[in-house]
Amino acid sequence: MIKVVLVDDQTLVRQGVKSLLSLAESIEVVAEASDGQHAIDLIPGIKPDVVLMDMRMPVKSGLEAIQELAALKALPPTIILTTFDDDELVLAGIKAGAKGYLLKDVSLEQLVEAIQVVSKGGSLVQPVMTQRLLSGL
């Protein structure tokens, strides 16, 4: 069972993602956080296999949370799950230590695949984002 922590400031999004992930037999949502600071306080004690992290949140952003958890050597494999398809955010997230970047319009199958890949040490950026990043080189 892959233990996942959801971090998103929107309650409805957290509840929806949790509900969808409950359909995947290999994944269990073990905790939720509503902002980056809450994630920083929560994650080291839980030690999840994967974190799904929104980028833009109050108190501390997802990027700030990733950076702080990495500095504490407490960053689990993290997938950024956001509505923002900004190339600079993608690169900043990956540079900070995220192992994946997905937009919130992904299918359940794509999300489950990303969680499985990242939990095994891999990385995954949504194909549309990868194509844009590579075309910009």
Model-based region annotation:
Residues 35-38, 61-64:
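Acidic catalytic/metal-coordinating carboxylates
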Residues 44-46, 68-75, 96:
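Conserved phosphotransfer cores of two-component systems
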Residues 57:
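Receiver (REC) domain active-site loop signature in two-component systems and cognate sites
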